[in-house]
Amino acid sequence: MMGGSSSRIAAGLGAALFVGYCIYFDRKRRSDPNYKNKLRERRKKQKAAQEKAGLSRLPDLKDAEAVQKFFLEEIQLGEELLAQGDYEKGVDHLTNAIAVCGQPQQLLQVLQQTLPPPVFQMLLTKLPTISQRIVSAQSISDDDIE
């Protein structure tokens, strides 16, 4: 019995210390005069990184016309960049197009027939990450609405 009560006391004491630690650093953070500036800078960097990834100009996935326009633009940009030899950016644009495509399997089959195997392999490796970023970007925009 004695071991059980002492472990409860230790757990309670640990929890109290943790809460105190959180409160201390929260107050320290809020009283920092540069906190808002640091927060603005961090948000600015995140926005710049998102724009660099091409996700800030994602269409509203509920607007079929905007999605179709985005899809066609991404395919065209991807093809142009691949023709210029910029495989990395070209594949990025093609993965954006695949991510918003209504029938991605058919598009992948067409791309597999038309793209050189190394470029198609690069496309396949980037697909999961771009799809995940689009899903997270869409959920962020849904959170902004609420």
UniProtKB/Swiss-Prot annotation:
Function description: Central component of the receptor complex responsible for the recognition and translocation of cytosolically synthesized mitochondrial preproteins. Together with tom22 functions as the transit peptide receptor at the surface of the mitochondrion outer membrane and facilitates the movement of preproteins into the tom40 translocation pore.
Coiled coil: none
InterPro entries: MAS20, MAS20_rcpt_metazoan, Tom20_dom_sf
Keyword Transport: yes
Residue list for modification Phosphoserine: S141
Protein name: Mitochondrial import receptor subunit TOM20 homolog B
Mitochondrial intermembrane side: 1-5
The organism's place on the tree of life at top rank: Eukaryota
Keyword Manganese listed: no
Comp. bias regions, Basic residues: 37-47
Subunit annotation: Forms part of the preprotein translocase complex of the outer mitochondrial membrane (TOM complex). Interacts with tom22.
Similarity annotation: Belongs to the Tom20 family.
Record GO cellular component, one term: mitochondrial outer membrane translocase complex
Keywords of this entry: Membrane, Mitochondrion, Mitochondrion outer membrane, Phosphoprotein, Protein transport, Transmembrane, Transmembrane helix, Transport
GO biological process per UniProt: intracellular protein transport; protein import into mitochondrial matrix; tRNA import into mitochondrion
Region (Disordered): 37-56
Intracellular or extracellular location(s): Mitochondrion outer membrane
TM ranges: 6-25
GO molecular function: mitochondrion targeting sequence binding
SUPFAM superfamilies: Mitochondrial import receptor subunit Tom20
Cytoplasmic-facing ranges: 26-146
Gene name per UniProt: tomm20b
Membrane topology: Single-pass membrane protein
